[in-house]
């Protein structure tokens, strides 16, 4: 059996800790034979465990402690610590592993709830489970979210080779915002969401680049954001914004500009991968 979980981008600018979008990069987990002990084969490196302390197995065992150990093989296109939901993908893969082997028959809603409890909020985990675009909130321990189709457009991911830990990126954020600024930040997010629902990517893109919640603080850790934004806008893109906590920058553009933008971004003197992606519509899947 095979489990496949997509990457995700969170925030989309002003949709801070609320908006998430599934992307066509994947964590894939092949479930092999039963074994005496858990072992997960992978080539990620970076100190990622191969035993039951791996997040995937740990998550599965928290849900189903009596699972029979298996040999697992993980392949992952999602680079860690780049703002593309690698930790959320691992958590969701663990939930799917337990659900599959223990026959828990969890609903998608239950999977989102469990994953959000682990990750703290649903912005990455909800689209990882459900696919497409999700707007969510966690209130008094309960998750509220809406899944909707995202407008058709090109997505160009500028993924620096250097990592940026979420903890470091959150550390530069203020504890509070002045009330008037928070009202303005909220109104920008509201217009962005309404524009997306209306398939108006030009207006949505303008709002994406006017975020007041987090990007102006995080830009000191991601100096290439302004450079990429200038290149993207000069060539007709809708917007460029941080993917999650960064350092990846995601460019939204008309499809006919995708290849040109990719080529232009590849010429920047920054060590990075520049990938053409799409919105992933299915979310986590199990292939039997």
UniProtKB/Swiss-Prot annotation:
Transmembrane segments: none annotated. InterPro entries: GHMP_kinase_C_dom, GHMP_kinase_C_sf, GHMP_kinase_N_dom, GHMP_knse_ATP-bd_CS, Homoserine_kinase, Ribosomal_Su5_D2-typ_SF, Ribsml_uS5_D2-typ_fold_subgr. ATP binds at residues 79-89. It is an enzyme of class 2 (transferase). Its main location: cytoplasm. GO terms for cellular component: cytoplasm. It is found in: Cytoplasm. Pathway: Amino-acid biosynthesis; L-threonine biosynthesis; L-threonine from L-aspartate: step 4/5. PROSITE patterns: GHMP_KINASES_ATP. Disulfide bonds: none annotated. The keyword Magnesium does not apply. Keywords: Amino-acid biosynthesis, ATP-binding, Cytoplasm, Kinase, Nucleotide-binding, Threonine biosynthesis, Transferase. GO terms for molecular function: ATP binding; homoserine kinase activity. Pfam families: GHMP_kinases_C, GHMP_kinases_N. Catalyzes the ATP-dependent phosphorylation of L-homoserine to L-homoserine phosphate. NCBIfam families: thrB (TIGR00191). Belongs to the GHMP kinase family. Homoserine kinase subfamily. HAMAP family: Homoser_kinase. PANTHER family: HOMOSERINE KINASE, HOMOSERINE/4-DIPHOSPHOCYTIDYL-2-C-METHYL-D-ERYTHRITOL KINASE. This is Homoserine kinase. The gene is thrB.
């Amino acid at each position: 059996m095979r489990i496949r979980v997509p990457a995700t981008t969170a925030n989309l600018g002003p949709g801070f800790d609320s908006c998430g979008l599934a992307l066509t990069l994947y964590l894939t987990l092949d479930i092999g034979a039963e074994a005496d002990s858990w072992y997960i084969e992978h080539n990620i490196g970076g100190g990622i465990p191969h035993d039951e302390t791996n997040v995937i197995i740990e998550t599965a065992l928290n849900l189903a402690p009596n699972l029979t150990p298996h040999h697992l093989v993980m392949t992952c296109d999602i680079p860690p610590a780049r703002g593309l939901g690698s930790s959320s993908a691992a958590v969701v893969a663990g939930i799917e592993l337990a659900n599959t082997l223990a026959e828990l028959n969890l609903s998608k809603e239950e999977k989102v709830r469990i994953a959000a409890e682990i990750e703290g909020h649903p912005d990455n985990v909800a689209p990882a489970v459900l696919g497409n675009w999700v707007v969510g909130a966690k209130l008094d321990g309960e998750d509220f979210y809406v899944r909707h189709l995202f407008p058709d457009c090109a997505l160009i991911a500028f993924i620096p080779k250097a990592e940026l830990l979420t903890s470091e990126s959150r550390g530069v954020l203020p504890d509070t915002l002045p009330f008037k600024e928070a009202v303005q930040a909220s109104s920008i997010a509201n217009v962005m969401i309404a524009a997306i629902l209306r398939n108006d990517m030009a207006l949505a893109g303008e709002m994406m680049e006017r975020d007041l919640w987090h990007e102006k603080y995080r830009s000191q850790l991601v100096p290439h954001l302004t450079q990429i934004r200038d290149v993207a806008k000069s060539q007709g893109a809708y917007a460029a914004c941080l993917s999650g906590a960064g350092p990846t920058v995601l460019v939204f553009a008309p499809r006919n500009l995708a290849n040109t933008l990719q080529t232009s971004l590849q010429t920047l003197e920054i060590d990075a991968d520049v990938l053409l992606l799409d919105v992933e519509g299915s979310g986590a899947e199990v292939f039997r």
